[in-house]
Amino acid sequence: MAGKRKTIEEIASEYLEGDNLRNFVDFYDFMKNNGLTVTKPSKILRGGWKIAYEGKKIGGFKIWEKNFWFCGVEIYKNLTDAETYEKYITAEQKQFLLDNFRTTPPCCKGKDNFEFFGKTYNTVCTCWPHFQGNPEGEALENAKQLILVNKKVVADIAAAN
């Protein structure tokens, strides 16, 4: 019989320490306090979890290895539509996204011809743009605010339908 699956809190305590653990706990508490759900999407995404609102994926995070984690926001067409998305995002948040937008090596079969704020990218990671490892300070706050932007966009799209 398989053992009990570890909770996110148990995994974080096992893998992270010091400021990295404190920052992750802060981020995880932020998600819980903002009505977001966190689920393990598949066995393929080792160490990764999906952040969702109203059943729509709006971000994710990974506890990747010993004392290393990262988070990101979901980028897909209905969240980046300029008329919808940009009315919620500040110029600084937009720049933060652009500065942290990552493409993937061609071997990962990322998405080609992906338009993001007027620029076309090739080999875009089909997961989500992730921010530097072990986010803290301004980077962590930007990640939180962008997740809230995605939550608001999802709510507005649902309200319009």
Model regions: which residues?
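Short N-terminal edge-element motif at the start of the domain
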Residues: 13-38
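A short, surface-exposed helix-loop junction/capping segment
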Residues: 1-17
